């Protein structure tokens, strides 16, 4: 199968991060899974992934890349961002599975423990976004809390990719606080933290037996399962009753033109 991974970061400025992501995904993917990497077109600053207005703009880029991936023959799409940007919107346009890693990780976490803790970056807006995603997933009653690491993001997501050991220890400190608040399982609410944890073999809170879940790797495995369910049993890629109702081609073209998005029905720039 061929799975497209859409990165919500600037390719040219994220070499160290990209290497860690590729290493992680190569470890967990099936032998017959081919990964195609795509990047959003406009992002240049890391802060553009945590504030509401640039998140909206990034969603448009993600949807475009997802439509493009389907036209190129991909079997599923995974957005490599723990905010799941564009996932809901893309599902209304695609006939292949569209996976949000945070949604996938939260629902998997519910099978590992009763109370879920989320460790994320040192950013108040993103910590609040993580709470919102747990609520959207229907798991707010099972959320033990959200803890941010104690390393500023400009350091964690630059120096950390070259030397992830200090970030690893910061994740452990935050996870222990969540366990003290009742968490039985910890989800990493950050793509960057996820890849640094997995690349330093951090999969549980030391000496506690509490799982720590890498959202990006889980997202890839969910994508593989979703493809199998559709191919083997003809399970629809999403429910077409409700918020994932499929938009017809005529109206899709109309809206792309109306908002001057500059791409055609296959996601290509026009």
Annotated model-derived regions:
Residues 1-19, 116-120:
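Short beta-strand segments enriched in small/hydrophobic residues
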Residues 63-108, 112:
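Glycine/small-residue-rich loop that forms an oxyanion/phosphate-binding "nest" at active or ligand-binding sites
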Residues 91-112, 201-223:
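Short, acidic/small-residue loops that bind anionic groups at enzyme active sites
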Residues 51-68, 166-172:
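Glycine-rich, highly charged phosphate/nucleotide-binding loops
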Residues 122-124, 134-191, 198:
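Active-site rim beta-loop-alpha module in soluble metabolic enzymes
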Residues 110-148, 166, 226-265:
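Short, glycine-/small-residue-rich phosphate/pyrophosphate-handling segment
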């Amino acid at each position: 199968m061929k799975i497209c991974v859409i990165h919500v970061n600037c390719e040219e400025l994220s070499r160290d991060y990209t290497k860690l992501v590729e290493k992680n995904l190569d470890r967990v993917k099936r032998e017959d899974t081919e990964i195609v990497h795509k990047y959003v077109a406009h992002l240049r600053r890391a802060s553009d992934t945590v504030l509401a207005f640039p998140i909206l703009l990034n969603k448009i880029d993600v949807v475009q890349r997802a439509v493009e991936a389907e036209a190129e023959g991909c079997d599923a799409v995974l957005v490599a961002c723990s905010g799941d940007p564009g996932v809901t919107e893309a599902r209304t346009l695609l006939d292949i599975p569209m996976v949000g890693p945070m949604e996938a990780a939260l629902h998997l976490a519910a099978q590992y423990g009763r109370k879920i803790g989320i460790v994320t970056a040192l950013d108040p807006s993103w910590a609040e976004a993580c709470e919102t995603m747990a609520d959207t997933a229907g798991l707010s009653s099972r959320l033990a809390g959200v803890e941010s690491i104690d390393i500023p993001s400009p350091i964690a997501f630059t120096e950390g990719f070259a030397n992830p050991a200090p970030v690893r220890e910061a994740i452990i400190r935050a996870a222990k606080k969540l366990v003290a608040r009742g968490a039985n399982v910890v989800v990493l609410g950050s793509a960057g933290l996820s890849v640094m944890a997995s690349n330093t073999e951090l999969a549980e809170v030391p000496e506690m037996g509490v799982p720590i879940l890498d959202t990006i790797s889980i997202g890839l495995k969910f994508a593989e399962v979703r493809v199998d369910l559709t191919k083997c049993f003809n399970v629809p890629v999403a429910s077409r009753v409700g918020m994932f109702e499929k938009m017809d081609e005529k109206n899709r073209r109309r809206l792309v033109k109306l908002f001057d998005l500059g791409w055609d029905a296959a996601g290509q720039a026009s």
